[in-house]
Amino acid sequence: MSDKIGLFTGSFDPMTKGHVDLIERASRLFDKLYVGIFYNREKSGFFTIEARERIVKEALQHLRNVEVITSQNELAVTVARRLGTQAFVRGLRNSQDLDYEANMNFFNQELAGEMETIFLLSKPVYQHISSSRIRELIAFQQDIAAYVPQSVIKELERINDEKN
């Protein structure tokens, strides 16, 4: 029997505790779960891809069946096929996420009909946390520790140390 392989993608700019929770839950559904840090052309980047990779790897190091990858110039379906993935895993916080993901799923099915998409609902405690809100809090120098893994705080400290 072949391994069940999933792919959870995002820009993770920055990663939130909601992301970590979804990935932990998804990791229990697969033999191998890839977490793909993808460059999103519709979003302006706060952290570099390299910084995001450090953040995500540290936040997920306790998950033995999870491997973090990055991609800047490929469609998720191309990466998924190369990795032998059977399913995309996506998190849903609200109806706006569902609308966005339904549109993405349409194109994923058009391009890679053999792949399934599994939607996991965010836990209520994480439904109002978004990377864009976290970036706004960072811009106004607010405490974000309740919303992000410690690796985000460490990366911000590293960036501040480099500036000083």
From Swiss-Prot:
Substrate binds at S11, K43, A76, R90. ATP binds at S11, F12, H19, G91, L92, R93, E101, Y126, Q127, H128, I129, S130, S131, S132. It catalyses: (R)-4'-phosphopantetheine + ATP + H(+) = 3'-dephospho-CoA + diphosphate. GO terms for molecular function: ATP binding; pantetheine-phosphate adenylyltransferase activity. It comes from the Bacteria. Signal peptide: none annotated. The record marks H19 as: Transition state stabilizer. Its cofactor is Mg(2+). Homohexamer. Belongs to the bacterial CoaD family. This is Phosphopantetheine adenylyltransferase. It comes from Streptococcus sanguinis (strain SK36). The lineage of its organism: Bacteria, Bacillati, Bacillota, Bacilli, Lactobacillales. The gene is coaD.
